[in-house]
Amino acid sequence: MAAIQANVTTGIPANANTITSSEPVRPLANFPPSVWGDRFLSFSLDKSELERHAIAMEKPKEDLRKLIVDPTMDSNEKLGLIYSVHRLGLTYMFMKEIESQLDKLFKEFSLQDCEEVDLYTISINFQVFRHLGYKLPSDVFNKFKDASSGTFRESITRDVKGMLGLYESAQLRTRGEKVLDEASVFIEGKLKSVVSTLEGNLAQQVKQSLRRPFHQGMPMIEARLYFSNYEEECSSHDSLFKLAKLHFKYLELQQKEELRIVTKWWKDMRFQETTPYIRDRVPEIYLWILGLYFEPRYSLARIIATKITLFLVVLDDTYDAYATIEEIRLLTDAINKWDISAMEQIPEYIRPFYKILLDEYAEIENIMAREGRANTVIASKEAFQDIARGYLEEAEWTNNGYVASFPEYMKNGLITSAYNVISKSALVGMGEIVSEDALAWYESHLKTLQASELISRLQDDVMTYQFERERGQSATGVDAFIKTYGVSEKKAIDELKIMIENAWKDINEGCLKPRQVSMDLLAPILNLARMIDVVYRYDDGFTFPGKTLKEYINLLFVGSLPM
């Protein structure tokens, strides 16, 4: 994919952002510049080093495989081992062996077996089963509640590790699991009250979980943090420790090369010259896509999805922070036509982007057609056209000073959340698992997809509405909710957060067996919701990436794990 190129037309003004007396007033956002520059262009992959790490992984991988299926290992110890394997991002290597063990243990499960088991162990067991699709009943936690009052016993507050396990377990709850709803609120308060008194790894574990529970974090980052903060668990088995370190190094090399490829592509396309008003966020977008799937086999998929998502950034910022309403209408019409002849009707400054967009999609479609999977590219392209129409709708609202009703806003807002474009584009390079049936399932837009899409829309709205409002945008979910239901701003935000919480419960339910599609296809849906949480939980981490995303990029691509 590094070779995928498009010729940029010449004759573009040196700075499309320059405003002369003859130009219209534009809604410029003055986005912060990239903090990375050309830093990632200089990486040079030594393929022999990558191969050495692949070979070195084989021995500890085989040793760990034997441990996972060891019939003499105690069930709690085995579940603890599988938990560490999962937290370290190694599950995909042993899925067959892990499922065979969990099938057996799940069939043998009995509530009576939990009577003498401590809170931490029960929590770990619960998380293992739930993370891997087995609906272990939440009743396992009822023993820690007072029978007369119905509240959690104060005695568990002396077990910080147990509380931490219960808090992480509560993130996996589905609708109607009252014991876990109560646990989430109760334990969060208790952990916040004691975290400042803790020391060492336990302090880091609690801080990490309170900042962002594992289930809602980016898998690659969570794996690295687990390796750093759970030394005892990671070093309990030599094969686990060795494999994790080698795996991290292998992924680091592969992913730095992918980041170099997309950075060079972006630079060669000259977007910063032809559309200088846009957000320059190549490492951030690559990180976002890496959050959907980190496994080595999805290297091509990551490169394709990153490029398409970068197109989306150019489109979004053109509609939102540069183009006039007349220009937006013309560009939307051209994208609907998807034909090079339409280039004459659009403003000169956006013509290079339009040509690159069509050329790149055509080349990706040719590549996928050779594998019999051009349908995934077509689905991505149609989603791109949908979002252009959605952006136009928002622009018309803003131009007319119109505040939509909340249902009206959500109908269009689910499109403009970019969820559909990113999720469909993520499928393009995934290979044979994206069958006709799998694509049809995506198109059917069932509950799990709807939930992830809703999180993508509302988490963004809750964090960005003030910035958008300051820039004269009337199309925000918070404003639509206030207008429709006559509530205060605080009440509107609280209600949207409840909707987000319930959507997480629906995603959790959708990932449990029996599933409609394989977890390979569900994982990007779950992980896209996770990445929305990463980017928007505390601030608009994409527009202003100086905090969380910068920290994560440094951890994965700048710093290096000592070998």
Swiss-Prot record:
Which reaction(s) does the protein catalyse, per the Swiss-Prot or TrEMBL entry?
A: (2E,6E)-farnesyl diphosphate = (+)-(R)-germacrene A + diphosphate
Could you state one GO biological process linked to this protein? diterpenoid biosynthetic process
Which cofactors is this protein said to need? Mg(2+); Mn(2+)
Where does this protein hold Mg(2+) 3?
D460, T464, E468
As recorded in UniProt, its EC number(s) are 4.2.3.23
Q: Name one Pfam family in it.
A: Terpene_synth
Q: In which pathway does it act?
A: Secondary metabolite biosynthesis; terpenoid biosynthesis
User: Position of motif DDXXD motif?
Assistant: 316-320
UniProt: Mg(2+) 2 binding residues: D316, D320
Q: Which UniProt keywords apply?
A: Lyase, Magnesium, Manganese, Metal-binding
Q: In which tissues is it expressed?
A: High expression in disk florets, moderate expression in ray florets and detected in leaves and stems, but not in roots.
GO MF terms held by the record: germacrene-A synthase activity; magnesium ion binding
What does the record note about the cofactor? Binds 3 Mg(2+) or Mn(2+) ions per subunit.
InterPro entries (UniProt xref): Isoprenoid_synthase_dom_sf, Terpene_cyclase-like_1_C, Terpene_cyclase_plant_C1, Terpene_synth_N, Terpene_synth_N_sf, Terpene_synthase-like, Terpene_synthase_metal-bd, Terpenoid_cyclase/PrenylTrfase
List residues binding Mg(2+) 1.
D316, D320
PANTHER family assigned to the protein according to its UniProt record, in alphabetical order = GERMACRENE-A SYNTHASE, OS04G0344100 PROTEIN-RELATED
Function comment: Sesquiterpene synthase involved in germacrene A biosynthesis. May be involved in the biosynthesis of the sesquiterpene lactone matricine, one of the major active compounds of chamomile flowers.
The entry's free-text remark on domains says: The Asp-Asp-Xaa-Xaa-Asp/Glu (DDXXD/E) motif is important for the catalytic activity, presumably through binding to Mg(2+).
Give the similarity note.
Answer: Belongs to the terpene synthase family. Tpsa subfamily.
Q: What is this protein called?
A: Germacrene-A synthase
Organism of provenance:
Matricaria chamomilla var. recutita (German chamomile)
Q: According to the entry, what is the taxonomic lineage of the organism?
A: Eukaryota, Viridiplantae, Streptophyta, Embryophyta, Tracheophyta
